[in-house]
A protein has these predicted regions:
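Glycan-recognition/cleft segments
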Residues: 86-94
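Extracellular receptor-binding modules and their adjoining Ser/Thr/Gly/Asp/Asn-rich linkers
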Residues: 1-68, 79-80, 94-130
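Short, surface-exposed alpha-helix to beta-strand junction/turn motifs within ectodomains of secreted
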Residues: 74-77
Length: 130
């Protein structure tokens, strides 16, 4: 069975750009850095809560997303908002209907907490596992 992504207009231009021209979304995390969010889109933006994240600490949260299948690849990048320039974000788990993002404060300096509202871009790459 072929995957139908016609509702999402995958776009490839003469400038060798690839992506979705519509179907994105945005969501803001509430309460704390481990509170899950729901966004049912193939691409979008997640804004994290500004709760303090201590040096050498990490926090993971679940993104519920009906567009994600277990064999898909989810890519994330930090758009802006990290306060100490030592913060990283990555996908730690992908499952059917969800994925988890981990935010890590990689600084070793005592008292160097991450306090920014981090904006994370994400995209779901539809994939098939053999």
């Amino acid at each position: 069975m072929a995957l139908d992504i016609s509702n999402y207009d995958p776009a490839v231009s003469a400038g060798a750009k690839i992506g979705y021209s519509r179907g994105g979304g945005a969501v803001t995390q509430i309460t704390d850095r481990v509170t899950g969010v729901t966004i049912n889109a193939l691409s979008g933006r997640i804004t994290t809560m500004t709760t303090s994240l201590a040096a050498e600490a990490s926090a993971a949260f679940i993104v519920t997303n009906s567009e994600v299948a277990i064999g898909d690849v989810v890519v994330v990048s930090m758009r802006s908002g990290n306060s100490n320039l030592q913060t990283s974000v990555y996908v730690s788990v992908t499952a059917a209907g969800s994925f988890s993002i981990t935010v890590a404060n990689n600084t070793t300096a005592a008292g160097a907490a991450e306090t920014g509202a981090i904006i994370i871009n994400f995209v779901v790459i539809k994939a098939v596992s053999a």
